[in-house]
């Protein structure tokens, strides 16, 4: 049976990307992405909510993000979801879902940058 794990998000970086390394020494970038949504309640009042996503970018894409993408930038991220499971010292099970970015496109523009920059790389696993 076919399967699909793909996500597209447009939002603003909640903090500057941070370079990290796995236990095996593989480098990646991690950051949060704020995606705003709004709707009208049954009474007609505007409601707003921000969903926060953890995003990891590996390899050259991660290097690009750390160097050029900063807090507040509007980006389009395409990638997949990855859920990690672990047990803590008390034996309690925890889960964390992260977006693994395959491409990141800058949607806002600074005067010294081109109108649109897109970087895509092959996916690298831990």
Where on the chain are the PLM-derived regions?
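Acidic, gly/ser/pro-rich intrinsically disordered tails
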Residues: 1-4, 17-24, 40-46, 90-92, ...
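Exposed loop/turn and edge beta-strand positions of beta-sandwich/beta-sheet ligand-binding modules
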Residues: 7, 27, 49-51, 95, ...
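OB-fold and OB-like beta-barrel modules that bind single-stranded nucleic acids
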Residues: 8-13, 33, 71-82, 101-104
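Conserved positions in beta-strands of structured domains
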Residues: 14, 18-20, 58, 82-84, ...
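Short aromatic-glycine-enriched beta-strand elements
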Residues: 19-34, 95
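A beta-strand/beta-hairpin structural motif
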Residues: 42-67
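Hydrophobic alpha-helical segments of small multi-pass membrane proteins
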Residues: 53-57, 81, 95-103
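Beta-rich strand-turn-strand
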Residues: 58-94
């Amino acid at each position: 049976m076919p399967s699909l794990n793909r996500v597209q998000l447009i939002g603003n970086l909640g903090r500057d990307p941070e370079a990290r390394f796995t236990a095996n020494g593989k480098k990646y970038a991690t950051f949060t992405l704020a995606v705003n949504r709004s709707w009208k309640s049954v009474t007609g009042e505007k409601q707003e909510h921000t969903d926060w996503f953890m995003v990891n970018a590996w390899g050259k894409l991660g290097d690009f993000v750390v160097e050029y993408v900063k807090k507040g930038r509007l980006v389009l991220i395409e990638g997949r979801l990855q859920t990690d499971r672990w047990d803590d010292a008390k034996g309690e099970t925890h889960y964390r879902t992260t977006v693994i970015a395959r491409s990141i496109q800058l949607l806002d523009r600074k005067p010294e940058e081109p109108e649109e920059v897109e970087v895509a790389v092959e996916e690298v696993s831990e």
